[in-house]
Amino acid sequence: MQELANKVEFGYADIDEAFPPCDPGIHPFGSRVLVQIRTPKNKTKGGIILTTETRETDAWNTQIAKVVAVGELAFKNRTTMEPWPEGSWCEPGEFVRVPKYGGDRWTVKTASGEDEALLVIFNDLDLVGKVTGDPLTIKAFI
């Protein structure tokens, strides 16, 4: 079964389809980072229409996200409030890998009004890493 799942391709047309523009309606406080989780496709590259349950499972298991906003104290020493020696781990517009569980999650309508975007606020130390490759090709493993 896992072998079949690894062969399914979703074929996003572009980055805006995977991370559609939306207004999160919030800016993170302190050392928190606001990210938008990659939006699941309605159908596969081969034309198979995905059920709502499949799309929801994909959305809640995807760990690739676009950084939307960074709190004023993110990536700073908690005692001195000075920036970390290595600097910020990520900036708005960059892509990161986030934990599957945790964070404060909610959805908002996208700018088109057709889909919902899943947004999550994490503590800066909870981010797993920066995506250096194509964020559209990284698959969710369920």
Task: Give the label of every model feature segment.
Residues Q2-I142:
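Compact, glycine-rich, soluble single-domain proteins
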